[in-house]
Amino acid sequence: MAKKKCGLLIKTAVAGIAAGAVYSVIGNILVENLLGKKSIKALIAQGGLMPSEESACFYTSDEALKGIEFYRKKVYEKLFTFNKHGECLHSIYYRNEGSHIYAISCHGFTGDPSQNNIYARRFYEMGYNVLLPYLRGHGKSEHYYCTMGWLDRLDIIDWINYIIEKDSEAKIILHGASMGAVTVMNATGESLPENVICCIEDCGFTSLWEQYSVQMKAMTKIPPEIILKTANPIIKSKLGFDINDNSPLEQVKKSKTPTLFIHGDKDSTVPFYMNYPLYQNAKCEKERLVVEGATHAAAGYVYPEIYWDAVTKFINKYI
């Protein structure tokens, strides 16, 4: 009987180790295939992660075409600065001579600064200087891994300081859509200079754990918590942070930066329900805009009048 029990324990242990090894492989695949620069390039070449019927407005709407034309014709500068680790950060910059107002607009996952040309055009025509940074793991970024807006928050603070060093009178607006929204929300949870006057976040998630859980439930029958718990040590090792750290929900609780929370009510990529907890838990001055009928990150493309009316009125309160 003792031998049978011992054998059963050994079999159970071996099965557990085998399962753990499988999940570890899955965790590695998750990190490399979702967050590695090589895979992100491949995703971009395939048209990104969103269904084509939802992403079409990014290329064919009137607002998109105006943004593309702006990007093609308007002269921009290529800027770079260094973070405290000596790593080079890259951005493109539209200069508005004589203006002391700056909009830092952050792109989404599988995007780059050109993805934000519709926002750049609008901010520029409002008379602002516009800085569009490359987020980690994307384009000219010298970081191999994407951190989904977490370590990027520190890069944004470096860009804020870069602007202030050049212009002590600077008034800075933070803006981002999707992962870019996560980036700017995460930044507002840190100690920011008074030069940062407000933040506009468009369809950011509550936490990386919750966002990945939502996506995995749609992709696999394996419980998301098993994959994420297995992937977390790999994320810690390769990216340098715990997946639970990336929580805009916790960051906005510490924020003192007035924030406009925007979300389309037909968003299934970053579910619409995530918007309200972010708004509700923010300790800063805040407003909320729900854009009816808008899918993920599409509000500014398909309902520009509603979008920019709210954004302009919000910014004008703090300039």
Give each language-model segment a name.
Residues 254-256, 261-263, 267:
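Short beta-strand/loop motif that positions the catalytic acidic residue
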